[in-house]
Amino acid sequence: MSDFNIRKNPLKIIIVGPQKVGKTVIANSLSEFSHTISPDYHPTVGVRVLETEKDYTNEQVSNISILKKNKISKVKIELWDMSGDRRFESTWPAIKYGANGVIIVLDAVNDKYEGVIDEWMNNFCSEINPDNVTCFSYKKEDSKGIVKNKQSHQFPNMTIAEVNHSMESLLPNFHKFITKLLIQMK
């Protein structure tokens, strides 16, 4: 990441996880594309790229050396909303190329995704610093059941943020993640 030019290039964040866990809902909310959740499921075909910008205050910029050095307070971000369908697995190497960070999305109440964090980490994070990965455990509005404690066995220090259907905690957790990425950049 040392040769990354924040003035010319947007941060590339890939959003991965199993099918039907809410990756698109989260990507839409983060990009401010849509804050409404459709009751109909429409699977992502391959990948969708959404663009957004994050504004930083002068105080925040002074704490993030890459922003201070480049005299900028606005960061462009590309969110790569990936299909969880394994039939697109052949495209994954091209999609993950040049990624600055990864968001793994899991269903907060579904037991069938046990151990899935490590699987997605192995597929998408082999060339990325584990500190540049976060996980959102998403509880859909119609989800029944108790939120399961999700944890990576291989990466026990990875942040796992719980996000409910109202998305209240989504933006603060996303901004923490982006700030952490920017602080690590030189």
PLM features: residue spans?
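TRAFAC-class small GTPase G-domain
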Residues: 1-186
